[in-house]
């Protein structure tokens, strides 16, 4: 199971929202949470595998506007991406793919991979000319063919590291 380290400012509700699970499910998996959260505390996120058992890793470089997929610490492929604009920057840190949806509609293109930060994901686009630019509302945009390929390879629980 995925273990999450509580950060300063996290609440039970914010963690549940980020991982798209109920607070009841979090409490059931972590009875000690009845006493409250403490920064640095490790909690189990039910329904997701231990990400360190998954051989894939995604590294996003905001500055280079690239997404690099690795298998067992060896680069498989690097994709061009679009990232958040100045007022809606792409968040940095370590996240996990927690769910996915094919053909989500609207500007999200052919696929949506939800990250463990509410409202953020890796997705396709209905505007391929935007790839390589800082134009999104914080999400990571890919060409549709690329996000379909990525989604066919990586399972839920895959670690996604985003750096400036």
Swiss-Prot record:
GO MF annotation list: glycosyltransferase activity; peptidoglycan L,D-transpeptidase activity
Domain comment (free text): LysM domains are thought to be involved in peptidoglycan binding.
The name this protein goes by in its record: Putative L,D-transpeptidase YkuD
PANTHER family in alphabetical order: L,D-TRANSPEPTIDASE, L,D-TRANSPEPTIDASE ERFK_SRFK-RELATED
Record bears the keyword Transferase: yes
Subcellular location field: Spore wall
Family: Belongs to the YkuD family.
GO CC, one annotated term: spore wall
PROSITE patterns in the cross-refs: LD_TPASE (PS52029), LYSM (PS51782)
Gene Ontology BP annotations: cell wall organization; peptidoglycan-protein cross-linking; regulation of cell shape; sporulation resulting in formation of a cellular spore
Protein function: Probable enzyme that may play an important role in cell wall biology.
Lineage, highest ranks first: Bacteria, Bacillati, Bacillota, Bacilli, Bacillales
Pathway: Cell wall biogenesis; peptidoglycan biosynthesis
Enzyme class label: transferase
Domain L,D-TPase catalytic: residue ranges: 56-163
LysM domain location: 2-45
Quaternary organization: Monomer.
